[in-house]
Design a protein with these regions (language model features):
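Active-site signature of alpha/beta-hydrolase-fold catalytic machinery across serine-
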Residues: 35, 113-117
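Flexible "cap/lid" loop of the alpha/beta hydrolase fold
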Residues: 59-67, 131-150
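Short beta-strand immediately N-terminal to the catalytic nucleophile in serine-hydrolase-like folds
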Residues: 101-103, 128, 154
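Short beta-strand/loop motif that positions the catalytic acidic residue
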Residues: 152-155, 159
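Serine-hydrolase catalytic machinery in alpha/beta-hydrolase-like enzymes
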Residues: 2-96
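A conserved short beta-strand
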Residues: 120-132
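Gly/Ala-rich beta-loop-alpha elbow adjacent to hydrolase catalytic centers
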Residues: 102-107, 111
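C-terminal catalytic histidine-bearing segment of alpha/beta-hydrolase fold enzymes
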Residues: 165-171, 175-215
Length: 215
């Protein structure tokens, strides 16, 4: 039985061209990214804000991965729901090259883990304060087609939740795997950088202006 994620939408146009899936972090919900979407101020876009399907152990919010390191992790609902969401977006008329994923913290982890398993490339990934949690599984499951998906990694130098070293490690893994990546560091803690909204806007409008091709 397929799983549907609770999802809100926000559009900046009656005929949007680009679709952006905004993936909240740990304990977040489908409302936390809307203000960020408005600050990015992207024309001709439709935003999709899904809610993570699992509750945190403390029951204070939502999580994309259920369980823990000792008992094991559950993520079937997450990947099933994300697959259904991206398929609906494509069926509604968006080309894969105009679909972007943006995620923060645990949401950035999911954006990378999910998008790079797809049997096709998408417009791009923006991973803020992210990391690769399941490295061995990622290295095994990442598809050749997904290496054409440009990636913008962003990480605060003073991040005390997910250290910037995790962002650097993620960058190194992706580059070694053949992905085109730009790693942007900024002076902040564990937060979405308001001063980098223009960079995100520019990346979504033209990823090649940020992520340079190797050829």
């Amino acid at each position: 039985m397929s799983f549907e994620l609770i999802t809100r939408t926000y559009s900046t146009s009656q005929k949007p061209i680009k679709a952006i899936i905004a993936i909240h972090g740990w304990e977040g919900d489908e409302y936390v990214f809307e203000q960020v979407a408005k600050l990015i101020s992207l024309e001709n876009s439709e935003w999709f804000f899904p809610r993570a399907p699992y509750r945190t152990d403390s029951d204070n919010g939502n999580s994309w991965f259920g369980g823990n390191d000792e008992d094991g992790w559950k993520f079937e609902k997450t990947f099933d729901g994300m697959n259904n969401l991206i398929n609906k977006i494509r069926t509604s008329g968006y080309s894969a090259s105009n679909i972007f994923l943006i995620g923060f913290s645990q949401g950035a982890c999911l954006a990378i883990d999910f998008a790079l398993r797809l049997p096709f490339s998408i417009g791009g990934i923006i991973a803020i304060a992210g990391f690769i949690k399941f490295k061995e599984r990622f290295l095994k499951d990442a598809t050749k087609e997904s290496t054409r998906t440009p990636i913008l990694l962003m990480h605060g130098n003073q991040d005390d939740v997910i250290p910037v070293k995790a962002g650097k490690t993620t960058n190194d893994i992706l580059v070694e795997k053949g992905y085109l990546v730009h790693f942007e560091r900024y002076d902040a803690k564990h937060k979405i950088p308001l001063k980098k909204m223009n960079l995100i806007n520019k990346f979504i409008n033209d990823p090649t202006s940020i992520v340079k091709s190797k050829t």
